[in-house]
């Protein structure tokens, strides 16, 4: 039974990621109503005007307005992009203490409005902050989603598509684990235009080194972009829009998001990037890909990395 009826999104955090996400929603007419909240109310005012001026060219009418936490009471989806930004040379996990404090305040304000929808978390370190949102909100695990490795998987598919000269949508390959340095590719189930990657590499052995380099490029892409222009935002904004679309269209789409594991992949009590079925009620279920021994070992290491960080976080004790 689908609980939610409308398509109202409240966006908290109107920085580079948040404003790019807002534009993606309006451009694609994914929502009926978009409310934007940020401490910088003047920037929100300007962005709301700018987005409204774009709506005559969007496929359908989208209502856009500046708001406050009380607007969350009837929202279907609250998307959190607020938090301290990642600095050059700083890992996503370095951000944890600063952003946990911010999230405790944000989630408390949202829940005080009697919010009863779905949370979508984008702020880094996203796996830990999705877990924190679940803990702070008291909502069922199905209704707290992190953006996880949706962007990493997109980068991975793009680079593989370029290597094999096919469209990215013809590549089925996932990055799982932490959205960060311990993420891993699921080579054992990757396929290009329906052909197993393993089979293709047997036909062109020289491609093995290229494939390994593709993962390195995928993993380190954010650092390269941050070094070049200070932040990444277009890719993750489109990923967030894709998750939003899957929710509101009740798609049962499989996307690599950060979800709570309760025995899947032999892990417990951790939010981490895995394939999951997304529909109007949030996460329907986690999809367990049979990993080979090496992949399982790397995934366990990734989960342990996140758990070790959370164990040190005073805000989660």
From Swiss-Prot:
Active site residues according to the UniProt entry: 179 (proton acceptor)
Reaction(s) this enzyme catalyzes, per UniProt: (S)-lactate + NAD(+) = pyruvate + NADH + H(+)
Disulfide bonds: none
Residues that bind NAD(+): 17, 38, 43, 69, 83-84, 105, 122-124, 147
PROSITE patterns with a match to the protein in the record: L_LDH
EC number of the protein: 1.1.1.27
Principal localisation: cytoplasm
Coiled coil feature spans: none
Compartments reported by the entry: Cytoplasm
Taxonomy, superkingdom: Bacteria
Biological process per Gene Ontology, one example term: lactate metabolic process
Record-listed substrate binding positions: 86, 92, 124-127, 152-155, 232
CDD domains in UniProt: HicDH_like (cd05291)
Purpose of the protein: Catalyzes the conversion of lactate to pyruvate (Potential). Appears to be the primary factor that allows S.aureus growth during nitrosative stress in both aerobically and anaerobically cultured cells.
Annotated family: Belongs to the LDH/MDH superfamily. LDH family.
Record's protein name: L-lactate dehydrogenase 1
Protein species of origin: Staphylococcus aureus (strain JH9)
